[in-house]
């Protein structure tokens, strides 16, 4: 598993660094052509063009000064996980300039040395609270995400 974990770490670092610098095309190139990126805030994006647009039109439209540090990357060549510490400065109305930090776990399915599916688990409420959103806005977002989780269980 050592060399497979090292290969995965190189791949996910290439993806995360491309995202941090706003290079959507380079991030999307880490995926198979019909790969999926499931973002904890923005939802699911399928295909390289959708992933490129997500990076450029969502991530970098709503935030700046990204930092994404990875640790404990493990892979068997098909399934992979990595812990991360992620931060950014918000551009969203009402939270402009707020630095947001959270940690989480990346869950990755691999195919032919590329990402077939990227997903993540982190505490979205912690991130929203750092942006000083009103409690009602945070509760509304968390209720929506909870309903999505419940629906996915069926």
Language-model segments: residues:
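General beta-strand recognition
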Residues: 36, 81, 116-117
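Short beta-strand segments enriched in hydrophobic/aromatic residues
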Residues: 31, 86-88, 122
């Amino acid at each position: 598993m050592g060399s497979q974990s090292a290969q995965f770490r190189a791949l996910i670092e290439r993806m995360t660094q491309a995202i941090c610098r706003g290079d959507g095309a380079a991030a999307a190139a880490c995926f198979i052509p019909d790969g999926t990126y499931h973002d904890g805030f923005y939802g699911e994006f399928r295909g390289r063009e959708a992933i490129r647009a997500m990076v450029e039109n969502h991530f970098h439209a709503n935030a700046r000064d990204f930092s994404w540090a990875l640790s404990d990357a493990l892979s068997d060549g098909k399934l992979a996980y990595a812990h991360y510490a992620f931060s950014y400065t918000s551009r969203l109305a009402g939270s402009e300039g707020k630095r947001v930090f959270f940690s989480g776990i990346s869950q990755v399915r691999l195919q032919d040395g590329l990402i077939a599916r990227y997903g993540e688990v982190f505490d979205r409420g912690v991130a929203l609270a750092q942006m000083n959103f009103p409690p009602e806005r945070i509760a509304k977002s968390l209720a929506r995400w909870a309903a999505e989780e419940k629906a996915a269980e069926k």
